[in-house]
Amino acid sequence: MIFPNLEAIEKLSIDEKIAQFGNKRKVKYSRGQYRSNMMLNPLRLKHLNRLDNLEADTVTLNLEDAIAPSRKREALVNIAFFLSHMEASNSFLVVRTNPLNEGGRQEIAFLNDFAFDAIRVSKIKTQKEVQEALGLLAKDKELHISMETKEAFNNLQSLRIDERFTTANIGILDLLNSLGLPQSLVQMGNPTIDYILSKFLIDCHSVGLQGTSFMFQEYQNTQAFEAWCKREKMMGFKSKACMGPLQVEIANRIFGVDEAQIERAKHIKEAFETHSREGEHGFMDERYGFIDEPIYKDALLVLKGLE
């Protein structure tokens, strides 16, 4: 926990919190895993107080749709206050802002001096908006977007104009609304949903973006959530939005790399590099059959996920 007790902090006004900002700066996230992305409400101080020790690989502090307009400033100051008193965190920390023209510009400017890892801008539509967000954002932070408009869905590949733009998060319900399609389509095996997820994933990978799959909002239905995670892993996803610790545990388990995969990848890497030094790039291996360069590259991809 960041603070041993919240009793005094809960009594502070917004201005009093600003006056008591600390000067701590957490170190940059370096674990390299992004299996789970848990959304937190910054109006709940108990949740913010645990930012230093959560199981989620990524934690997103949400200033957008879950916060009423009358409380957005309070939520923004809460985020800054806890960040300013935090020395370290197990998680990659993201702040999800409102759209640029609905307060997002001001939120980014306010937060730039605090220590976190990325800003996630909502309702992005155009390359111009991405360019503006990058211009507003401090150079040491990544840019993420919520991919929830038909414009972004149709032009995602053209939006990556800078390496600091690293991640797109698909908001399936908002996207369906933007496309004029009903939310009832979100069912396992629906071909339209499969197409949307597949297109999103391939568009991300083709331009070097990490794609995070959608949030399953029936958070008590862990069986259905696990089924979605397994299907998305089969499709090629490596990251899933989460509501609460139960979903985080499932996502971390399913999107993790198991020991058998790691052992296989290490063996293939060592065997290929040994044969390669002898000028042989295709050979039969006693344990895993035929190994050539594409299989070697896949093994490197598995091992890269452990960095």
What are these regions (language model features)?
Residues 1-307:
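Expand to "…catalyze enediolate/carbanion chemistry for C-C bond making/breaking, isomerization
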